[in-house]
């Protein structure tokens, strides 16, 4: 949870999270309409905390629990007497109904996936979007449903599986929907949310990235004062935006350290040095530690072992370089909003680690520095917008996500060598060049090549070859949580494969990965 006074926005919406997998989408949709929103877990929200946050309205998210069971999550009962507009979504609708005297049941018939609602009456939530008698598509995902509504409410939409698909208490500005307006599968959902934030709550929609930039610069200056900040640059979007923002705030008080572990993409290190040292005139220490990293990784095949070795070695090198420049009072990190809110467990138990994340989490304690995290209220797409506001080049802020361990986890099932890294680096560059030439780079969430631990027989010229097979991966996504493979046409794939085989010595076979997430992950390791 972020500090409640961290963003100086007059108009703000509080989202109380009951554990839905798509709560972040609610926040994104609200912010897309120019209104700052913040997610707070149900078990931390009180009447006092709501008053301190001073929202213009409150949204109750969905969740996996059943209102009909004992000891399941509830909103603070005082919320409903504070005079604030409230919108309950799915579980949020159900708990509002139950807490206000209505009834929720667990019927035999459930609704999951696409459904259609029939609008039975008008209300402020539907203004300009739906009219009585209209039928439209929504996305449902519920087992329980409202069986009786509290006094003051009326039904405004129904569906086959939900007789109270949407309800309204216009006098108190309470609204509930059984469907999910935040997902793209509810085509008019964003318009409904905008009606709530702008029309019902009266938000002005003036939260912009330009305004955020000014506020963030002021906060950095206030926090740092005359202190010194050190920032680890990786070439990725997050660290680049952090460095540019802090430099605009405090100038020469910032020192950046670029630790080159030898596993960056082609030309990436040179671009980072050029942009930050030459264009922004930032003090930048560039350490080529590739020999050290590759030595530590010699013979290592296990992906988790790779990540841990790279993380630990990075900390050692970063610490060494920081001491050389005289140390610092603060460490800048590119923590994003999903990193903050994903740490909340709604079951009280640990979450399963699918892959450990490479970060500099061990540095603050070891180096006795306070953290500066100016991006901790932003989603990834907002970070890109902020980067553009700060004047970073599009080829940097629009860059596809790249893992901290770099190309090390794109050479699976085999020990790393410079030769393999060079083969992968050249093949990856050709692939991305062709994607850009086809005008597809900004359409695709992430694309990369993977050097497989397989050698295959081929014929090149009149001679037998026995070289590596290479996999190509490209996915579309909105947030990286789920993803689908990009459907390239065969002509494009043939052109890429032909170039790689002809231009990259050591590869004689190219395949395309058509696995979605889930069941696969985007990266191979």
UniProtKB/Swiss-Prot annotation:
Biological pathway: Purine metabolism; GMP biosynthesis; GMP from XMP (L-Gln route): step 1/1
Stored Gene3D superfamilies: 3.30.300.10, 3.40.50.880, HUPs
Keyword vocabulary terms for this entry: ATP-binding, Glutamine amidotransferase, GMP biosynthesis, Ligase, Nucleotide-binding, Purine biosynthesis
Catalysis: reaction(s): XMP + L-glutamine + ATP + H2O = GMP + L-glutamate + AMP + diphosphate + 2 H(+)
PROSITE patterns: GATASE_TYPE_1, GMPS_ATP_PPASE
Residue ranges annotated for the GMPS ATP-PPase domain, each copy included: 207-399
CDD domains (UniProt xref): GATase1_GMP_Synthase (cd01742), GMP_synthase_C (cd01997)
Function: Catalyzes the synthesis of GMP from XMP.
Oligomer status and interactors: Homodimer.
Protein name from the UniProt record: GMP synthase [glutamine-hydrolyzing]
UniProt source species: Rhodospirillum rubrum (strain ATCC 11170 / ATH 1.1.1 / DSM 467 / LMG 4362 / NCIMB 8255 / S1)
Top-level taxonomy: Bacteria, Pseudomonadati, Pseudomonadota, Alphaproteobacteria, Rhodospirillales
